[in-house]
């Protein structure tokens, strides 16, 4: 199954600031998202439908729209910072 990957501005801003090796690792993990490795659904009512992908010390927050086969990356950040927002 082929998914379309959409990276929102908030996540893109964080990713472009990463050093090259980390940026490549995070982007590689994002484009492998549909296969799913270290993926968990976020807890809490306000986080319904949001998932997190762990990439080293970084977390990628995303949602999946199976009707349209879209993975939408909504945010990314350091572990401590990202969980304060979600």
Language-model features, listed with the residues they occupy:
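A short, surface-exposed loop/turn module that caps and links secondary-structure elements
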Residues: 29-54
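Enriched for short, Lys/Arg-rich terminal
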Residues: 2-6, 10, 16-17, 21-24, ...
